[in-house]
From Swiss-Prot:
Name assigned to this protein: SRY-related protein CH31
Keyword set includes Transcription regulation: no
Domain of life (superkingdom): Eukaryota
Subcellular localization: Nucleus
GO cellular component: nucleus
MF term (GO), any: DNA binding
N-terminal signal peptide: none
DNA-binding region(s) from the entry: 1-54
PROSITE patterns reported in the protein's UniProt record: HMG_BOX_2
Organism of origin: Gallus gallus (Chicken)
């Protein structure tokens, strides 16, 4: 979406992607949720002492 609309602000891109995400079924969301869990576990293994500090 960002490549197709290079002048679009990130906030607008986020809104549109959020709206598209809400339209997906649970089955369509599942691969993304599973990948996020896998990456989270990998990150925790590689960086066990990591603490989010905004």
């Amino acid at each position: 979406m960002a490549q197709e609309n290079p002048k679009m602000h990130n906030s607008e891109i986020s809104k549109r992607l959020g709206a598209e995400w809400k339209l997906l079924s649970e089955a369509e969301k599942r691969p993304f949720i599973d990948e996020a869990k896998r990456l989270r576990a990998m990150h925790m293994k590689e960086y066990p002492n990591y603490k989010y500090r905004p």
